[in-house]
Amino acid sequence: MQQFEEVHSILEKAKKITVLTGAGASTESGIPDFRSANGLYADANVEMYLSRGYYNRSPKEFWKHYKEIFQINTFHQYKPNRGHRFLAELEEQGKDITILTQNIDGLHQLGGSKHVIDLHGTLQTAHCPKCKAGYDLQYMIDHEVPRCEKCNFILNPDVVLYGDTLPQYQNAVKRLYETDVLIVMGTSLKVQPVASFPQIAKREVGATTILVNEELTGQEYNFDYVFQNKIGEFVEGLSSRK
């Protein structure tokens, strides 16, 4: 209980809060953890199907597999959960809060957060590789192979594919160097370069670091506070301190 009280006080006083989220932030909305032992990424071919090279070589086949892997046609059923709303509420209270998410579901934005850096892109949109016109999720659902209405080019998904660089990485690191508090929620911290963020925040910036994850990550030494909880449980614990 004392940890909850201390963290509540830290968040009350913090000027700039950065939150790094992973799959655990969305599993409470019913979205499967694609990287789990039984997840869709367990298929040996998935990395090929979701690669930039495969999109370039076989864009029609790419879209078929992309839709199957991410279950695009049923994605509207997923809604923001208590964790998403909690972060949006912090922002509504006037906190300078930025979310760095590894998730591609767009639920932080749907939950009301305005300052979100999608490290791995988003499933919610795609764009024309020629004219850059944007298209939403419903357009992708409605068209077997989505094409630009103006150029007729097959759309490029806004998810970062294997073989792509992380276009938002530098923006994320810049934010880390400005932050007072880093909260890491629902990620095993196994994927680089994101796995280095807690060390940057604690060792180089001197920020207060907080981990919320059901499983231990092996990086507990980089955190001032460790909560081995579901995110919803953590939020409930903080709420009871008000």
UniProtKB/Swiss-Prot annotation:
The keyword Transferase belongs to this UniProt entry's keyword annotation: yes
PROSITE patterns: SIRTUIN (PS50305)
Compartments in which it is found: Cytoplasm
Binding site for NAD(+): 23, 27, 34-35, 102, 104-105, 120, 187-188, 213, 231
Residues the entry annotates as binding nicotinamide: 34, 104-105
Domain of life: Bacteria
MF-aspect GO terms: histone deacetylase activity, NAD-dependent; NAD+ binding; zinc ion binding
Cofactor(s) listed in the protein's UniProt record: Zn(2+)
Deacetylase sirtuin-type domain sequence ranges: 1-242
Enzyme Commission code: 2.3.1.286
Keywords linked to the UniProt accession: Cytoplasm, Metal-binding, NAD, Transferase, Zinc
Chain residues that bind Zn(2+): 128, 131, 148, 151
Enzyme class: transferase
Catalytic activity of the protein: N(6)-acetyl-L-lysyl-[protein] + NAD(+) + H2O = 2''-O-acetyl-ADP-D-ribose + nicotinamide + L-lysyl-[protein]
Main function: NAD-dependent protein deacetylase which modulates the activities of several enzymes which are inactive in their acetylated form.
PANTHER family for this protein: NAD-DEPENDENT PROTEIN DEACYLASE, NAD-DEPENDENT PROTEIN DEACYLASE SIRTUIN-5, MITOCHONDRIAL-RELATED
Family: Belongs to the sirtuin family. Class U subfamily.
Name of the protein in question: NAD-dependent protein deacetylase
Annotated source species: Bacillus cereus (strain ATCC 10987 / NRS 248)
